[in-house]
Amino acid sequence: MLLHYILKAYMKTTLIQLSPHQMSNESLVPWGRLFFQVIDLQIPKDAVPADEDERERCEWWKAKKWAYATLGRLYRRYGDPSQLPSTLKEDYGAFADSFVNTFAPEIIKVFLHQVELYVSGRVWLSKKCQYHIFTFFSDCIKPKSTWHLIKPHFETLVSSFVYPQMSFTHAKVELWDTDPVDLVRQQVGKRACKPAAFGFKLTTSQMMVIISIPPSLLQRPSSSSW
């Protein structure tokens, strides 16, 4: 399948700069729609391996990984005017203003929907896709323009998605018993999920919400409400 190579190639073109064409709506909108369609694609079970490690490496999930990564990269590098380096403001200032107001809200909506599906058990997410979701949400916390879109979902996002990543689950216990080196690699490796990075960027009031979550989880059945 060529799709994941196409998405990977596009991602690589954004690493250093965006061309005027890439910043135009004639290019950005259709590419954005493609990324959203790939992320939203419901993959039939018989189209991917049953083994989760093999599924991580299959073409469909590589395509999804590059879709998540590219959307996050566009926002983090070029699309957030409040975090744009002064050396880039002249070339990308206008693009960032447009991106954060028109495109970033759609990315947030799509990512939140995938998290909702994941925590409710309706879809599976690869570890690398989760990594890119965590990274994107971490980048969206500080800027007011994106934080106000995430804030209504904040408590549920932390309790249902972030906190479980920090918990020592039965699967992690088994891996610790059989291969502790692999467990450490997964938790601190380059592509490990980033709940810690998410937490570091929170204000004191937001941190108080997080601190109250573990006791509340012990007092009620596991559930999610979006």
Name what the model sees in each region.
Residues 1-2, 6, 14-15, 19-31, ...:
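Eukaryotic non-catalytic interaction scaffolds in large regulatory proteins
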Residues 4-16, 72, 76, 138-139, ...:
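Structural signature of alpha-helical solenoid repeat scaffolds
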Residues 5, 37, 66, 73, ...:
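Alpha-helical scaffold segments in carbohydrate-active enzymes
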Residues 6, 10, 30, 38, ...:
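Extended, noncatalytic alpha-helical scaffold/tether regions
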Residues 14, 22-25, 41, 45, ...:
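Alpha-helical repeat/alpha-solenoid scaffolds of the HEAT/ARM/MIF4G superfamily
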Residues 21-37, 48, 81-94, 98-113, ...:
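Short sequence/structural elements of tandem HEAT/ARM alpha-solenoid repeats
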Residues 47-59:
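Internal amphipathic alpha-helical repeat/solenoid segments
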